[in-house]
A protein has these predicted regions:
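Alpha-helical transmembrane bundles and membrane-interface segments of multipass inner-membrane proteins
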Residues: 1-216
């Protein structure tokens, strides 16, 4: 049985969410908060922390901010799902085959759909933490759960030379944020779209119509 493009994207998204949640639950149930596990030297560590805010540990204004952030995440997730669904329909012609432009390229490249699916799966992974982890692990009400983070890459941990203006003698750490698999999905998906699929987003519907009419 042939699987439709939409179902393939759904399966990809669900697989990414499952991987994200497995990693988080393993860390949450087997590590103490703040515990380090050194994977490769000092520069790749599993560091169990929880944050109440956005990606990479950024925070957003207390209880009210947390509530608004949860609503924002849900709205963003719904918008992304709608966008992907509309692009899937747009990518197919009346016979269910890939819709092509005059130059032979696909009207909606597969890479665009995959990139958006990565972002959507990452958003859902962190939404699950925010909505349900407080209830599941019995520490907060619905929508006030904390996001589990664990990947830490302090690749450069040093001190600025004293002769460097303004920052001399100060501690320098790169890369400081602690993040999770869902954050990685969002980041990889966004960077992929920016660097490899920018032509699709630069192309307007009006320009598509002109191209299509030129060959009729």
């Amino acid at each position: 049985m042939k699987i439709s493009k939409g179902k393939k994207l759904l399966l990809l998204g669900l697989a990414l969410v499952v991987i994200d949640q497995i990693i988080k639950i393993v860390v949450k149930t087997n590590m103490e908060l703040g515990q380090h596990i050194y994977v490769i030297g000092n520069w790749f560590q599993i560091l169990f922390i929880e944050n109440e805010g956005m990606a990479f540990g950024m925070k957003f204004g207390g209880a009210v901010g947390k509530f608004l952030l949860s609503f924002f995440r849900i709205g963003l997730f719904a918008a992304l799902c709608w966008w992907i669904s509309s692009l899937v329909r747009k990518s197919l012609d009346a016979d269910g085959k890939p819709a092509l432009l005059a130059d032979g390229s696909k009207r909606v490249p597969q890479g665009v759909l995959i990139g958006l699916t990565l972002i959507t799966a990452g958003a859902l992974g962190n939404i699950i933490d925010s909505l349900f982890y407080g209830i599941i692990f019995d520490y907060a009400p619905f929508m006030f759960g904390k996001v589990v983070d664990m990947f830490y890459f302090p690749i450069i941990d040093t001190t600025w030379p004293s002769w460097v203006p303004f920052v001399g003698g100060n501690h320098f750490l790169f890369f400081a944020p602690v993040f999770n698999f869902a954050d990685s999905c969002v980041t990889v998906g966004a960077l992929y779209l920016i660097f490899f699929q920018y032509k699709f987003f630069a192309r307007s519907d009006e320009s598509e119509e002109k191209i299509e009419k030129s060959v009729k």
